[in-house]
Swiss-Prot record:
It is a multi-pass membrane protein. This is Protein translocase subunit SecE. GO terms for molecular function: protein transmembrane transporter activity. It is found in: Cell inner membrane. GO terms for cellular component: plasma membrane. The chain crosses the membrane at residues 17-37, 41-61, 95-115. GO terms for biological process: intracellular protein transmembrane transport; protein secretion; protein targeting; protein transport by the Sec complex.
Amino acid sequence: MNKHHYNRNKHKIPEKVKWISISIFFILSFFINMCFYETQLFIRIFIISCLMLCAIGTMIYTKKGKDILLYIVMSKKEMQKIIWPKYKETLYTTFIVISVTIFISFILWSIDSVIFRLIAFIISLRF
C-alpha cells in the first residue's frame, strides 16, 4: 500500500514540474510583451514564439497534453471519413432551403394580413 502510494506520487512530481514550467513560459511571454514594448516588434515576436513553442513542446510530454494530441489526431481521422457533399448538391440544397423559406414567409404574411383585417373588421363594428 505504502509503496503504491509512493510510486503514484513519484509520477505526479514530474507532471507538476512540467505544468509549472508551462505556466512560467506563458507568464514570461506575457511579461516580455508588456515590459519590452519599446524593442522591435520582430524581436518580441521571435522571443514570444520561442517561449510558446517551448510551452507547447513541454505540454505534449504531459499526460493531458498526450490526451489532447490523441484527441486531435482522432478528430482528424474522423474528418477524413466524412463524405462531403459536392458543389452541385450543396447548390440544390441551398436553393431548396431558400425557396421553402420564401414560401413559408409568404404563407405567414398572408395569414397575418387576414388576421389583421379580421381584427380591424371586428373592431370597426362597435356595438
